[in-house]
């Protein structure tokens, strides 16, 4: 029997995985082992239908407090858990990529989810921080609170400069 991410302590070692880009081509996690990573692992239902952590994601984009020379942020779509049409979602994401240069990749078969043993990610808008040494050092699974924001900024500050 496997165990969920909630039951695992952090930091813990994670490996690079090969999943797909928005066109179905195989890709590895960008800059894995070269930079610290800020990963937005998103069930589209949580973002589009439930508005979970949307404001915080927009805040991060606007204030730049998670940006820096040592960190790279990108999104991974948790497609197996959504009820929304996949091709429609890919089209929306491709437009976002064209508009602002965002990196968004597709975990269409739960490869990332399973290899990193993330537990239940259905209806979640998760934030993960991975060190360039390949250690998962932070997971936000639920909607962020004021105290959670302080903790996130405290942790991300260590990895962005």
Where are these regions (language model features)?
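Short active-site neighborhood of thiol/selenol oxidoreductases, capturing the structured segment around
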Residues: 29-53
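Thiol-/selenol-based redox modules, centered on thioredoxin-like
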Residues: 123-161
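Hydrophobic h-region of N-terminal signal peptides that target proteins for export
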Residues: 1-7
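Structural micro-motif
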Residues: 15, 99-103, 118-128
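N-terminal "domain-start" segment that seeds a small globular fold
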Residues: 7-27, 48-52
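Short acidic-hydrophobic, aromatic-tinged amphipathic segments that line or gate anion-handling sites
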Residues: 20, 102-109
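Structural microenvironment flanking redox-active thiols in thiol-disulfide oxidoreductases
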Residues: 47-97, 113
